[in-house]
Structure formats: structure tokens, C-alpha cells
């Protein structure tokens, strides 16, 4: 399997960064080809420019995003590692989805019906790895926007039998060192079996 691991957290000493390293190493250790994208380290710009928006339906990624678009085309598994902030994806991760998964990369419009036709049918796995400051109950009440974005909206564009996984640590701010270590271990084991 070819896995693209997309990571969003500004701090190199964060639990999220540990999860990113763990995910990439576990996948590689299981024999998968792995490419990691550290959006903050790359200086990825979250906001779509006016020029990008004007050319949105020209079926081509902006030149600065060509490498990211090619990696999406290359991958058959997408893994997202990030902290949940304000009950959703960090702005940089949401920006990556909006700027990279554009017409010509993620989908195109049928010429006659103008309905969305997927260009991500090669994606067989979507995995989300995240931490929440809130409890499971609070996240459920707020409808878990990040999970819905990745496992529903993105999943709809993927292969018909695309499998998904959601690996989450809730109440991370009050979790113990042992709970965080156990979560890292569970992520490692789960991805080693992907």
C-alpha cells in the first residue's frame, strides 16, 4: 500500500507529533510505502488565494500545490494526524483539503449533468488520528466535524469499498502519561495491521 500521511501541528514536541512519527514508522515497518507531509514544517498556506478560487474549475492544481496533488494521485491510503481544535480540523488541515482536493485532483464535473464524479476511486483506506481536549460525550453532542469531514465527505469520493478507521484520544488535557502512552501504542499496533 502507498500511504500519504498528512500532519498538522505547529509544535515538534507535541503528542500529535509523536503520533505522526509513530504512524509513519508503523506503516513503513509493515512494508508500506509512506510519504509524510508536515504542513507546518512545509510552511503550507491554509488560505485559498483569489487566483486559486478563480481557477478552481480549470481541473488543475495550483503550481505550488502540484507536489501535493501528485502525492494524492500516488497514494491508495490517506492518513490524517492532527489535534482537534474548536471541535474541528485545524485551519491548516482544512486548508489542505480545500486547496489540494480540487477539481482535476479529487473530482471533476460530468460534462453533461454537472454532477461530481470522483477522481479518488484509487483510495482504499482513510484513517484519522486525533486528540480532543473534550470528552467523548461532548464531542458526540457537537457532532464531531473533523470525523464527519474525513470519514463521510472525503470517504464519499474514495473507492466503493474504502475502509476507514478513527483513532482518537478524548480528554487529552486531563489524560495521564500512561493513557497517552497507551494511545500511542494502540495507534502503532493498528497501523501495523493496516
Q: Model-found features: residue ranges?
A:
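Active-site donor-binding loop signature of nucleotide-sugar glycosyltransferases
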Residues: 39, 131, 169-171
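A structural motif corresponding to the C-terminal end of an alpha-helix
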Residues: 75, 81, 121-122, 156-162
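Short, basic/glycine-rich phosphate-binding loops at helix/coil junctions
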Residues: 43-51, 127-131, 166
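Short, structured loop/turn "capping" segments at alpha-beta junctions
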Residues: 103-108, 160-164
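Short, glycine-/small-residue-rich phosphate/pyrophosphate-handling segment
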Residues: 108-156
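N-terminal beta1-alpha1-beta2 submodule of the flavodoxin-like/Rossmannoid cofactor-binding fold
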Residues: 1-105, 182-194
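Short histidine/acidic/glycine/proline-rich micro-motifs that form metal-
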Residues: 10-13, 84, 133-137, 171-174
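Glycine-rich phosphate/pyrophosphate-binding loop and the adjoining helix
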Residues: 137-141, 145-194
